[in-house]
Amino acid sequence: MKRLVKSLRELQAAGRWDIDFHLPPEGIKSFPADTLCRVDEVADVAKDKRDPTRLPDVPFQYLDISSVDVATGSVANPQDLEGAEAPSRARKVVRAFDILISTCRPTRGAIAVVPRKYHDQIASTGFSVVRAHDDVNPFYLHFALRLPSTLEQFRKWSTGSSYPAILDEDVAKTLIPVPSAEEQDRIALLVVLALDARDQAIRKANYAWNRTLGEITSRLSGSAVMPDAMEKAESGSVPITTADIQETIRSLPELTIDGRNTSTEAQAVLI
């Protein structure tokens, strides 16, 4: 049986009486203590906002929870909307290489890095937007935020039964392992290359599957099987090291935030 002694004042200050909240997380203990940092020591929780409805005819891309592929932690299929169509939750302005963390049911791991092409676009207020410090690799930070030890802490901070949720403050106090800058870059490279290899394998498998179905259909209909070239993988150059990422960020336009850069001509540059 787990036992923990807390004073009434401590319980009242935390606003939580459940033992799971107050017990120290277990998973994070597997990492060296001298590498552990709070998220707010290596990143900021961004609060930039813009109301798209103020420019009803201006198009934008909306990143909501359904835009995140939980399996890979990548952004997939954001919505193309005009300002007049913006839902009330479409308010958070995101910068390239920001990290989106779904605050509703956070243990699902709906956590993604914002690609360059969605710089200055709009995300749901259902995300906590984490912006890595200049000396921290966003791809490494994304990896660390999806670790089981991180999701365990998100579970501890969660409130609510049907739709457990966390706050920006909970994200900020979460502990993650943070190695040297050089090691961060190495890990980021491994993760990005592994994800690219996974994507290529899926594309090849889908191609083989569709080609086989096409051949079977052609045989049944008596028509000749037409050869076709396999679709090539997209080959954009994605900056991975912290230095390259910072250089890319400096080349991007400023974010369009309410009260700053709000002219109707202010549009995000898609790269």
Please annotate each region the language model reported.
Residues 1-53, 177-271:
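Non-catalytic DNA-recognition/assembly elements of restriction-modification systems
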Residues 37-52, 66-96:
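Sequence-specific dsDNA recognition surfaces
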Residues 38-46, 74, 127-178, 182, ...:
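Basic, amphipathic alpha-helical recognition segments used for DNA target recognition
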Residues 52-61, 156-158, 227-228:
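Short coil/turn segments at secondary-structure boundaries
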Residues 53-61, 92-94, 112-125:
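Short, surface-exposed loop/turn microsegments at beta-strand edges and helix-strand junctions
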Residues 88-89, 117, 161:
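A structural connector/turn signal
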Residues 98-100:
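Beta-sheet entry/capping signal
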Residues 102-146:
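A short beta-sheet element
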